[in-house]
Structure formats: C-alpha cells, structure tokens
Amino acid sequence: MKFTTEARADLARLDLQLARRVFNKLHRLVENFEFLVPEPLTGDWKGVYKLRIGDYRALYTFDKMQLLVHFIRHRREVYKIK
C-alpha cells in the first residue's frame, strides 16, 4: 500500500484516533482484497474506487501488486476534488 502526497497530508490532518481507524481499515482492505468487491466510482472518477470509513472516504486505485491511496477526506468534500 502506498499513499500519494495528498493522501499523506489528509491522514496527517486527522485526529490520532480517526487516523488509526483509517489506516487499520486500509490495512484490512489490503490483507483481504481477494475476498472483497471494490466500490468503483463513475464519471470523472472512473477507474478510482472508494473505501467507506464512517463519514470519511479513501479514494484509491490498484493493480495486481499494489494499492495506491489518493485522498482521505470527509464524504462531503472528497468528490469535489477534481
């Protein structure tokens, strides 16, 4: 799992408890990826997937070997980025 510069900054802005929750959920996604169905986005976000973490969303892409987290933002903000 890798994080973009934006995702690292997003994670750093969260309070410690929420940041741990986000990181743990992303880690579980990576560990159990073959058993989960990713939630794809549409429109301008085609090719990007979301992970719901309470009121927050992690937007990521993946290939066979790696998951790349692009953003971690509140649900009211995350889709307005592009």
Model regions: which residues?
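Enriched for short, Lys/Arg-rich terminal
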Residues: 2-9, 13-20, 53-56, 61-82
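N-terminal processing/targeting junctions
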Residues: 24, 35, 65-66
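A short, surface-exposed loop/turn module that caps and links secondary-structure elements
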Residues: 27-51
